[in-house]
UniProtKB/Swiss-Prot annotation:
WD repeat segments: 17-56, 62-104, 156-199, 324-366, 404-443, 462-507, 558-597, 1351-1390, 1392-1432
Organism: Homo sapiens (Human)
InterPro entries: Quinoprotein_ADH-like_sf (IPR011047), WD40/YVTN_repeat-like_dom_sf (IPR015943), WD40_repeat_CS (IPR019775), WD40_repeat_dom_sf (IPR036322), WD40_rpt (IPR001680), WDR7/72 (IPR049916)
Keyword presence, tRNA processing: no
Gene name linked to the record: WDR7
Protein name as it appears in the record: WD repeat-containing protein 7
Length: 1490
């Protein structure tokens, strides 16, 4: 899914808990979470309460093979990170608090054990992971980036390591790694902090190698209590060794011929050893094993038989002898919480966790009686105890009489074009149902609960037993008929269905086993094969079934082993089949002949050579874990391809690919705001359905449909401003004329979209209807079966209704809840909704049902939450208290959607959805019933205008139609519409600013600043605005102390840029020589393998990797992302809360120095401003760095830099080259008009248009924040430019310079300044006039006059224009008058007054110029020369001026001190060629005659 899409999963688990055959167990350091990995590749997080009660919280998807080991990966108490490894060599770093995957990698080797090791370098703590497995060394991996740093290697008899332990030495700085190889040789490596910090790949050899004759070693553990003993457990005996010289102290055989699988020290004198059938034994060690006793080592050297310790102390047994598929996994942990528990945790193949608390029993002198289990729970039990039961997607349609279990769904496919979900069930029936409607039934309460068999659906019956797979070929390739749906079952048959009529078209019975997979051949196969689908069955056969000819054109059935992979060589007409034994069969498709069968390396090469690998995950047939990664690369993600707007990398291979080249192109939008993906954790499980909501696509769809509604509201300025996404302070830049053009374009694109995507709304042209009828034979209409349009409803609004109802925090504000239910039409959830979280590389965490129920019976004063949610218990409270990442995503989604709905006309979910034909927006042909009347938008000052104001209410035909019956039809629609918008506004405000207070800080998990920072310039304007509002609200909420913490946390990641900022004029080659190493390579640093993943934007592109030099320049994704985030976060804090921001001349309350964050102080007064300088350097670097593949011209990070430079210009100004920055911004918006002219309503802007828009906004902000800086800088550039232009050599490229191309933009900003900051403009009026003269075409001014070309400047009384000889007079602050001659482009200055000039005016015949200054109270008359040559302007002679008269005038008093009236004190009006009136602002007149 595109780099930055905001995609939220909601999961419907169904009543049967997923299979979870546990293969690894871990207890986190804080003792609050148990982590289990299973053989199918999922990881489950279980909450453990202080009373040792367990509640399953989430299931993490991402591994494609069985989990082999788990380890903690972080030692700090605030971060709970774990690392997992699977059989296929994948390693993932997870955040336990919310299930996010932080980093992942894939190695060519399988780890069987990982140990975390932390050491200190100076004052920094570094984490390392020591991994061992099916390879003859120990790999040392960085715990944050998962990069392999170096390895510990054996010189003597290298072999696989079976287990390993780290011995920490408190006396010396050296730590020891002790490992046992498979052959029973003990290896010792010494690891020092110097070695650990080394970055080279030199291996480290062992210090010691000693055979200790321990075969089949299962575990090795170091005694933390005595710091002297080692326990080695082998399958048939266990032994204790002295850690000093590895001499044997004691040994114990296995009990009753059982096999030991592990052990650990319970205390200094007790060990616990467990067997493979789940029993555990505690032994008391003899005194000779205890360093504290006098007889320590007294038995060394005796025969092994004499070293057997006393009989076992306590026997622990499982209470119920369940039959298990494989041995349970047992581990011993001692927690370090307030209650110091020693826990034995065991997980088994049925997904059950058992816990024994050993602390209290270790002291009892007991005999062999069993110790009772403290707690035991399985996933299925956790599901069963919930009321209501966890819902499946079509439970209400799958009720079996006299059974409380519904029919299981065994195969599913979603058809996004129709919004239909097709579910195959275990009884052979197939149900087609509208996905949003059936999800609403399962998740939300409403009138649908009273109807049986709701929503209307269709059932196809044809298979005799379970349906195993479904395929909708048209979705994969448009070459297939869109009516056809293909199903395969356990009855060996493949059936073609017509989904429109519901009839069975054909049955293929060619296989001799159940159908396991249905595939689509690639595009470039032969014409005959193109109309086939490929079916794979469990009798090891593959068929090509032609949908056109209705026959099997080829059956390949000689394979001896199960089929693992199907590949294609269309060019050679080959079908390549890979089997589970490694053999490969090559079949000719046309003839059906077996071309060859090969094994070994040739087989591998053949498979690799098939370029056209059909994206069936390599082992999807043999391995049951159809996890998200595979789903994402298979048809299911041909399904999700719709969400993956324009970048879907091959996640199956985890290759990090860069598609920087794409970034400039406008992404292709699919319009699927909802995707339904069925996943199975195990082949035997029923389907779990995950609904993926793509927030951006949903917003686009809502706006697109809104734009297609033919009401004049579209042209209202409010909406246009919305369209331009202008959060600009400068007004809308779309004028009425362009709006009409835009409206036309919008209608065209909308028509296309609606035709394409809303077929079920039967709102199509007659042509489509006719076509549809022809396609679907006469019986299509006559047959009694309903057509596919089972229920007519608005798919987009339904999706929004479902999503918003699930996200809203119910029960916190009763008044708002009422508004949501009655006015907005949202529905309350039945029970807590299980959301998910997508993270990097298609990894996903899904909340298990009941995740928010406390695992404890009664702890910390929490009362047991009723299983049924009482009305008061807010369902939404659950999601905002889960984790910070979840809160961030949910708040972003709900605020951006609420803002979108608010900008629409009467966007309420109350409609006639439940009835058959709903009221529809009028067709384009129907005239609008009443023209929209806009009333001024009501303003709410929440979050200083960051939350959008309620849009002006607009009447449309639809608002009457949509009235729910409760209102009298006469109630004015205008009012309803206004109330609806106000409702959305309140909803957005509550989630943006009031949640922490309503929920209480103990429950509320605040949003993550860094996640919001990364969306500061999100591609989707609504999400961008929501992120900015949320981030600013959160920064305000945490107040100064919190902001200081954020700065301290992120400042170390801020890249240290060099001071040479590259001006746009400098070529990139020159730039490279200016910069200093190592930063020169910075922006190029490995951004190549940038990965556009599901969660974060390409904000990392182009960030330097130059963290403090003692660390190696890490190029890991996370590191680069942190740098980008640091720049944005510090930029926002600096810009919004930085040094005193006081716009000149406008008296605002100066910020008290205590409010300024440390590091962002003013340059004066000795305050600390280092951070402001570094942040400013980073921002200007990103703006001015020439475009390169590593930092594309319109990347998100560059756009963010533009935005922040504009926002915080007053903070950054002292440290930046203002001229370079302004020119850089002008360069970006030189073509803004062109870019922004062709935007389509609702769709995100193209990256180029977005950059132009941001640059334009930044320029307006800079100009209004510091008008003098802007005016003087641009005037200086203009002078420099004109001087260059005079130099003939550089003439040819003058018109291509930035300044020349951005003339329109400069004029736009000057106009804003004249409008908003007239006083500043008057102070520098001559410079402003210089800029205007440069930007306006001389010929145009001559033809039309200044008044028409640039009316704004003519408002000033100190500017006068004489049309006949094209002269402009401008009065300056220091008493001089500048005279411009437009024909020659020359300027001449005359000095005549001591103070600022108040007014100037040319006489009607142009012979005289009158100037007046209020300060020195003089009016002067100047005579223009009347010589013939001068008047013709020959010889470029400047006009001769002389002062012919000066009069004294009593001064005019301003109306009120300090007001703008100072600019309008008096004006000069010529009544004839010789008479002039000085008109004061209060109406007094003084007449003068020349």
């Amino acid at each position: 899914m595109a780099g930055n899409s905001l995609v939220l999963p909601i999961v419907l688990w169904g009543r049967k808990a997923p299979t979870h055959c546990i293969s690894a167990v871990l207890l986190t350091d804080d003792g609050a979470t148990i982590v289990t990995g299973c053989h199918d590749g999922q990881i489950c997080l279980w909450d453990l309460s202080v009373e040792l009660q367990i509640n399953p919280r989430a299931l993490l998807f991402g591994h494609t093979a069985s989990i082999t080991c788990l380890s903690k990966a972080c030692a700090s108490s605030d971060k709970q990170y774990i690392v997992s490894a699977s059989e296929s060599g994948e390693m993932c770093l997870w955040d336990v608090s919310d299930g996010r995957c932080i980093e992942f990698t894939k190695l060519a080797c399988t780890h069987t054990g990982i140990q975390f090791y932390q050491f200190s370098v100076g004052n920094q703590r570094e984490g390392r992971l020591l991994c061992h497995g099916h390879y003859p060394e120990i790999l040392v991996v960085d715990a944050t980036s998962l990069e392999v740093l170096y390895s510990l290697v054996s010189k003597i008899s290298p072999d696989w390591i079976s287990s390993m332990s780290i011995i920490r030495s408190h006396r010396t700085q050296e730590d020891t790694v002790v490992a046992l190889s498979v052959t029973g040789i003990l290896k010792v490596w010494i690891v020092t902090s110097e070695i650990s910090d080394m970055q080279d790949t030199e291996p480290i050899f062992e210090e010691e190698s000693k055979p200790i004759y321990c075969q089949n070693c299962q575990s090795i553990s170091f005694c933390a209590f005595t710091q002297r003993s080692l326990l080695v457990v082998c399958s048939k005996y266990w032994r204790v060794f002295d850690a000093g010289d590895y001499s044997l102290l004691c040994s114990g055989p296995s009990e009753n011929g059982q096999t030991w699988t592990g052990g650990d020290f319970v205390s200094s004198d007790k060990v616990i050893i467990w067997t493979e059938n789940g029993q555990s034994y505690i032994y008391k060690l003899p005194a000779s094993c205890l360093p504290a006793s006098d007889s320590f080592r007294s038995d060394v050297g005796k025969a092994v038989e004499n070293l057997i310790p006393p009989v076992q102390h306590i026997l622990l047994d499982r209470k119920d002898k369940e039959l298990l598929i494989c041995p349970p996994v047992t581990r011993f942990f001692y927690g370090c919480r307030e209650y110091f528990h020693k826990l034995l945790i065991q997980g088994d193949s049925s997904g059950r966790l058992n816990i024994w608390n050993i602390s209290d029993t270790a002291d009892k002198q007991g005999s062999e009686e069993g110790l009772a289990m403290t707690t035991s729970i399985s996933l299925q039990e956790a599901f069963d105890k919930l009321n209501p039961c966890p819902a499946g997607i079509i439970d209400q349609l799958s009720v079996i009489p006299n059974s409380n279990e519904p029919l299981k769904v065994t195969a599913s496919v979603y058809i996004p074009a129709h919004g239909r979900l097709v579910c195959g069930r275990e009884d052979g029936s197939i149900v087609i149902v509208p996905a949003t409607q059936t999800a609403i039934v399962q998740l939300l309460q409403g009138e649908h609960m009273l109807r049986r068999g709701w929503p209307p659906h269709r059932t196809l019956r044809g298979h005799r037993n379970k349906v195993t797979c479904l395929l909708y070929p048209h979705q994969v390739s448009a070459r297939y008929d869109q009516r056809y749906l293909i199903s395969g079952g356990v009855d060996f048959s493949v059936i073609i269905w017509d989904i429109f009529s519901g009839e069975m078209k054909h049955i293929f019975c060619v296989h001799g086993g159940e159908i396991t997979q249905l595939l689509v051949p690639p595009e470039n196969c032969s014409a005959r094969v193109q109309h086939c689908i490929c079916s794979v069955a469990s009798d090891h056969s593959v068929g090509l079934l032609s949908l056109r000819e209705k026959k099997c054109i080829m059956l390949a059935s000689r394979h001896l082993f199960p089929i693992q992979v199907i590949k294609w060589r269309p060019s050679d007409d080959y079908l390549v089949v890979g089997c589970s034994d490694g053999s490969v069969y090559v079949w000719q498709m046309d003839t059906g002949a077996l071309d060859r069968c090969v094994m070994g390396i040739t087989a591998v090469e053949i498979l690799n050579a098939c370029d056209e690998a059909v994206p069936a995950a390599v082992d999807s047939l043999s391995h049951p874990a159809v996890n998200l990664k595979q789903a994402m690369t298979r048809r299911s993600l041909a399904a999700l391809k719709n969400m993956a707007h324009h970048k879907l990398q091959t996640l199956a291979t985890n290759l990090l690919a860069s598609e920087a080249s794409d970034k400039g192109n406008l992404p292709k939008y699919s319009h699927n705001s909802l995707m339904v993906q069925a996943i199975k954790t195990n082949l035997t499980d029923p389907d779990i359905h995950v609904l993926f909501f793509d927030v951006e696509a949903l917003i686009i769809q809502l706006l697109t449909e809104e734009a297609s509604r033919p009401n004049t509201a579209l042209i209202s300025p409010e909406n246009l401003q919305k369209a331009s996404g202008s959060s600009d302070k400068g007004g809308s830049f779309l004028t009425g004329k362009r709006a009409a053009v835009l409206f036309q374009q919008v209608k065209e694109t909308i028509k296309e979209n609606i035709k394409e995507h809303l077929l079920d709304d039967e709102e199509e042209d007659e042509e489509i209807m006719r076509q549809r009828r022809e396609e679907s034979d006469p019986e299509y209409r006559s047959s009694k079966s309903k057509p596919l349009t089972l229920l007519e409803y608005n798919l987009t609004m339904d999706t929004a209704k479902l999503f918003m109802s699930c996200l809203h925090a119910w029960g916190l504000n009763e008044v708002l809840d009422e508004v949501c239910l009655d006015r907005l039409g949202m529905l309350k959830p039945h029970c807590t909704v299980s959301f998910g979280l997508l993270s990097r590389g298609g990894h996903m965490s899904l909340m298990l049902p009941g995740y928010n129920q406390p695992a404890c019976k009664l702890s910390h004063g929490k009362t047991e939450v009723g299983r049924k949610l009482p009305a008061s218990e807010g369902v939404g409270k659950g999601t905002y208290g889960v984790s910070r990442a979840v809160t961030t995503q949910h708040l972003l989604s709900i605020i951006s959607l609420a803002n979108t709905l608010m900008s629409m006309t009467n966007a309420t979910f109350i409609g006639d959805h439940m009835k058959k034909g709903p009221t529809r927006p009028p067709r384009p042909s129907t005239p609008d019933l009443s023209k929209a009347r806009g009333s001024p938008p009501t303003s709410s000052n929440i979050v200083q205008g960051q939350i959008k104001q309620v849009a002006a209410p607009v009447v449309s035909a639809r608002s009457d139609a949509d009235h729910s019956g409760s209102d009298p039809p006469s109630a004015p629609a205008l009012h309803t519409c206004f109330l609806v918008n106000e409702g959305w506004s309140q909803l957005a405000a509550m989630h943006c600013v009031m949640l922490p207070d309503l929920l209480g800080l103990d429950k509320f998990r605040p949003p993550l600043l860094e996640m919001l920072a990364r969306r500061w310039q999100d591609r989707c304007l609504e999400v961008r605005e929501a992120a900015q509002a949320l981030l600013l609200a959160e920064l305000r909420r945490i107040e100064q102390a919190g902001r200081k913490e954020a700065i301290d946390a992120w400042a170390p990641y801020l890249p240290q840029y060099i001071d040479h900022v590259i001006s746009p004029g400098v070529t990139s080659e020159a730039a490279q020589t200016i910069t200093t190493a190592p930063d020169a390579s910075g922006p190029e640093a490995k951004v190549q393998e940038e990965e556009h993943d599901l969660v974060d934007d390409d904000i990392t592109t182009g960030c330097l990797s130059s963290v403090p030099q003692m660390k190696k320049i890490s190029t890991s994704y996370e590191e680069r992302r942190k740098q980008a985030t640091a720049i944005v976060l510090l930029g926002v804090i600096g810009a919004e809360f930085g040094a005193e921001i006081e716009p000149p001349k406008l008296l605002t309350r100066p910020r008290s120095s205590s409010q300024i964050p440390e590091g962002f102080g003013l340059t004066s007064g000795g305050s600390n401003y280092s951070l402001a300088r570094h942040t400013c350097k980073a921002l200007t670097f990103l703006l001015l760095q020439p475009p390169s593949p590593k930092l594309p011209p319109h990347s998100t990070i560059r756009r963010t830099a533009i935005d922040l430079i504009g926002r915080g210009f007053t903070v950054w100004e002292p440290y930046m080259d203002v001229s370079a920055v302004l020119m850089g911004l002008l360069e970006l918006c030189a073509d803004a008009e062109k870019q922004l002219a062709n935007i389509t309503m609702g769709l995100p802007l193209s990256p180029a248009a977005d950059s132009a828009r941001s640059a334009r906004h930044a320029l307006s902000l800079i100009a209004t924040a510091r008008p003098p800086a802007f005016i003087t800088t641009i005037a200086k550039e203009v002078h420099r430019h004109t001087a260059l232009a005079a130099n003939t050599q550089s003439q040819q490229n003058m018109h291509t310079t930035t300044l020349a191309r951005a003339k329109g933009e400069i004029l736009r900003v000057i106009e804003i300044l004249i409008e908003k900051m007239p006083t500043d403009v008057v102070d520098l009026l001559v410079e402003v006039m210089d800029i205007i003269m440069y930007c306006l075409e001389g010929s145009l001014v001559k033809k039309k006059g200044l008044q028409e070309c640039f009316p704004a400047i003519c408002r000033f009384y100190m500017v006068s224009y004489y049309e006949r000889n094209h002269r402009i007079a401008v009065g300056a602050r220091h008493g001089s008058v500048a005279l411009y001659d437009i024909r020659t482009g020359k300027c001449q200055t005359i000095h005549g007054h001591k103070g600022p000039i108040t007014a100037v005016a040319f006489a009607p015949d142009g012979r005289y110029l009158a100037t007046y200054s209020n300060t020195d109270s003089h009016i002067s008359f100047w005579q223009m020369n009347t010589s013939l040559l001068g008047s013709i302007g020959m010889l470029n002679s400047a006009p001769q001026l002389r002062c012919i008269k000066t009069y004294q005038v009593p001064p005019v008093q301003p109306a009120s001190p300090g007001s703008h009236n100072a600019l309008k004190l008096a004006r000069l009006i010529w009544t004839s060629n010789r008479n002039v009136i000085l008109m004061a602002h209060d109406g007094k007149e003084h007449r003068f005659m020349v």
